Amino acid sequence: KNYILDKNERILKKNNTFLKITEKEIDFIEILNSSTKPLSKDFILKNIWNYSTDTDTHTVETHIYRLRQKIKDKFKDSNFIKNSKKGYSL
């Protein structure tokens, strides 16, 4: 999608547009980008937040919503993070 992730500056870039992102958002983008298949909410909770999969939380959904909004507002891209029955992917 022509995005560049600068972890040191905590910036997501596309063309000449920059978006400041948090460490968790970087972790989230990296884990999704490293996978060839969609990742489940439980997998993301365990690997990014170290939460038990028994925990009832909306952490993943909340972070996805916020990151999608930031990317949509800045880059006009509403399909950066996709979700399906199998999980989330880039």
Where would I find each of the regions flagged by the language model?
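A structural micro-motif at secondary-structure boundaries
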Residues: 2-27, 89-90
